[in-house]
């Protein structure tokens, strides 16, 4: 075996020292991210400037009017409403089965609200990823309308220790408190539907769909046994919740499916964004030690990190690990589906990535519409170009790689054609 050059040993030792933070230290607080020390450049920061003169007036509005204002301003549809009755939130003391927390979402923002409490907002920053804010009616000038919240990070940094979204399924008791010692789990793409939505209200779901939603109990068997799962159907939330306090009286199952999908993809995008920025930040020092020219393309561990994140992005975008739908499919009340389709981008054949299937899977063409999102567009150019080039290669390959094997040839062809026509700024490596 040939000897290892001294410069590689020195470089490895240097990087090891740089990457050895204290056990409770978050890497995203260091350059180039510097999460807490950096002022976000997101939509909420700009809205604070616009609403500065109205902040006190808006705080005095009735709660539902404030919620409507936030939703309309952030272009988040009220029809996306979900209701969570478990006390797993910053405002846990206000939440109960009779007073659930409402969640709303779009491709670019997430909004949470509990009657009697503040409005929680998550949006995305080009460098920081997920950023968290609170609109509190009790605040007074000179506080801005939207206040950045560091408390959210106590729970919202669980996805590879980056600021992220979180969707949990737990075993709630009659008061919405998670049962002691019962555990719970994050909802991932592969999570079976029988294990999802513990602590959530689920409306519009077919009787064939077994899940943990709508159920309160005293032991795990109350949720997972046939009796518990079969009692999960709720014909009308008005029997439990004073629904007139909320924009809608539903927590639609299709909106839940979409929320699960988007939370996962947004988390993968945010992690890829931060990890690749860190790798690219370290690349000049590595390049200098290796004696490479300034225009040298990323190599070594930097390239390995970019390759790894590109693979994860492709897996998430193509719904590689999607749990199988129950026989007969999943149908909701149709309200969310109609609103979701309004922003579809169609190709010349009328096909769109926002077309839903709901028979055997979520999307008719299994490539996430979040590929059009600002978050994906904000990825470092090196990573975005690499991801899209790999995506086009896999979609066009006669013998597709493993990440594409779940997609039939006709579906791969359709996805490629849709993206070629509808996705802006395709890289030179995109195969046409």
Regions found by a protein language model. Name each.
Residues 24-116:
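N-terminal alpha-helical interaction blocks
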Residues 1-4:
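N-terminal secretory signal peptides that target proteins for export/translocation
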Residues 7-17:
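Bacterial N-terminal signal peptides
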Residues 78-86, 323-331, 399-410, 427-431:
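Surface-exposed patches in mature extracellular/periplasmic domains of secreted proteins
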Residues 111-297, 301-304, 310-318, 360-432:
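Sequence context surrounding c-type heme c attachment/ligation sites in exported
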Residues 316, 329-359, 375-376:
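Acidic, glycine-enriched catalytic cores built around paired aspartates
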Residues 20-22:
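Boundary at the C-terminal end of the N-terminal hydrophobic targeting segment
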């Amino acid at each position: 075996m040939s000897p290892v050059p001294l410069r590689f040993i020195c470089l490895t030792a240097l990087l090891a020292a740089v990457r050895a933070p204290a056990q409770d230290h978050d890497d995203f607080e260091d350059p180039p991210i510097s999460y807490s020390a950096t002022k976000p450049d997101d939509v909420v920061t700009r809205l604070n400037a616009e609403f500065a003169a109205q902040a006190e007036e808006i705080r005095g509005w009735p709660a539902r009017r404030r919620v409507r204002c936030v939703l309309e301003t952030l272009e988040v549809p009220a029809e996306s409403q979900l209701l969570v009755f478990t006390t797993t939130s910053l405002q846990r003391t206000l939440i109960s089965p009779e007073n659930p927390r409402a969640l709303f979402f779009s491709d670019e923002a997430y909004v949470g609200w509990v009657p009697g409490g503040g409005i929680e907002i998550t949006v995305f920053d080009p460098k920081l990823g997920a950023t968290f804010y609170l609109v509190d009616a009790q605040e007074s000038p000179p506080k801005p309308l939207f206040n950045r919240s560091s408390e959210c990070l106590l729970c919202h940094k669980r996805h590879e220790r980056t600021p992220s979204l979180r969707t949990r399924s737990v075993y709630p008791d009659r008061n919405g408190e998670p049962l002691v010692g019962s555990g719970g789990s994050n909802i991932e793409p592969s999570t079976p539907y029988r294990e999802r939505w513990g602590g959530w209200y689920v409306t519009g779901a077919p009787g064939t769909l077994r899940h943990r939603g709508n159920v309160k109990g005293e032991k795990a068997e109350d949720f997972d046994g046939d009796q518990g799962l079969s009692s999960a159907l709720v014909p009308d939330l008005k029997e439990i919740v004073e629904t007139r306090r909320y924009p809608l009286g539903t927590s639609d199952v299709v909106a839940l499916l979409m929320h699960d999908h988007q939370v996962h993809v947004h988390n993968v995008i945010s992690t890829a964004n931060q990890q690749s920025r860190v790798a690219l930040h370290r690349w000049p020092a590595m390049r200098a030690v290796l004696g490479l020219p300034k225009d040298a393309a990323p190599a070594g561990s930097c390239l390995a990190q970019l390759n790894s994140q590109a693979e994860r992005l492709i897996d998430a975008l193509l719904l590689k690990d999607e749990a199988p739908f129950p026989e007969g499919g999943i149908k909701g009340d149709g309200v969310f589906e109609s609103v979701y389709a309004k922003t579809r981008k169609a190709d010349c054949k009328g096909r769109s990535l926002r077309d839903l299937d709901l028979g055997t899977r979520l999307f008719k063409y299994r490539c996430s519409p979040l590929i059009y999102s600002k978050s994906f567009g904000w990825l470092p150019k090196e990573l975005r170009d690499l991801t899209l080039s790999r995506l086009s290669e896999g979609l066009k390959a006669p013998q597709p790689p493993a990440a594409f094997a779940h997609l039939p040839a006709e579906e791969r062809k359709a996805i490629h054609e849709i993206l070629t026509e509808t996705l802006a700024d395709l890289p030179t490596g995109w195969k046409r």
